[in-house]
Amino acid sequence: MSSYFVNSLFTKYKSGDTLRPNYYECGFAQDLGTRPTVVYGPGTGATFQHAPQIQEFYHHGASTLSAAPYQQSPCAVTCHGEPGNFYGYDALQRQTLFGAQDADLVQYSDCKLATGGIGDETDNTEQSPSPTQLFPWMRPQAAGRRRGRQTYSRYQTLELEKEFLFNPYLTRKRRIEVSHALGLTERQVKIWFQNRRMKWKKENNKDKFPSSKSEQEQIEKEKREKEQASGTQSAGEDCDKAKQM
């Protein structure tokens, strides 16, 4: 059964021809003469041998298998040019990237410059560290740290009291004018007026500060009347005590 397939296979080839077509019969074989190829070693083709079972199977064409062209020469195709220039690659690219010495880096000028720049940068950072400028908002804020109280001079307090008696609520424009006149910030003026209104409410036992000047004047008038009434009452009591004595 096996001889039938072998005989049918050998009828397609003449005596002396190989089972495989010749390498030069391919269409692109003619163009290989101008292309460089890579050689892996001078003895690669000579040491290559077929497996013995192939020759035993094709016993009729054992003589033809021994005439394969790749066994006669180390290279099946004639090599032209340096093997290192295959497809434009230089032989330098076959060097190892790791463990390269400075002598090898001379051929790679850009690589040498890059490595030298990295070393210089590290040396500069170690030798002369750049001083960082710290701004007030960059400083860490402690949990228990409080902002210091603003102290006002007598002149500033007097002017603020006058402004408060004239108008307890300042507009944005007036607050800017007062802050520039007294050398304070808008925030400081705003906080002072807030504290002053709270103080007034405590002194007058009021839950709400008067929203208008007329209402404030009415409250002040009532306060004066109470003081006068209490003064007359205390004066009458003093007179009664003097009479009794």
Curated annotation (Swiss-Prot):
Coarse class of the protein's main subcellular location: nucleus
Pfam families: Homeodomain
GO biological process, one term: regulation of transcription by RNA polymerase II
Basic and acidic residues composition-biased segments: 202-228
One MF annotation (Gene Ontology) recorded for this entry: RNA polymerase II transcription regulatory region sequence-specific DNA binding
Domain of life: Eukaryota
UniProt subcellular location: Nucleus
Keyword Nucleus in record: yes
The organism of origin for this protein: Danio rerio
UniProt cross-references to SUPFAM superfamilies, sorted A to Z: Homeodomain-like
One GO location term (cellular component): nucleus
UniProt short sequence motif Antp-type hexapeptide, positions renumbered to this chain: 134-139
Described purpose of this protein according to its UniProt entry: Sequence-specific transcription factor which is part of a developmental regulatory system that provides cells with specific positional identities on the anterior-posterior axis.
Family recorded in the similarity comment: Belongs to the Antp homeobox family.
Keyword Nucleus attributed: yes
DNA-binding region per Swiss-Prot/TrEMBL record: 145-204
Entry keywords, A to Z: Developmental protein, DNA-binding, Homeobox, Nucleus, Transcription, Transcription regulation
Annotated protein name in UniProt: Homeobox protein Hox-B8a
Stretch list, region Disordered: 202-245
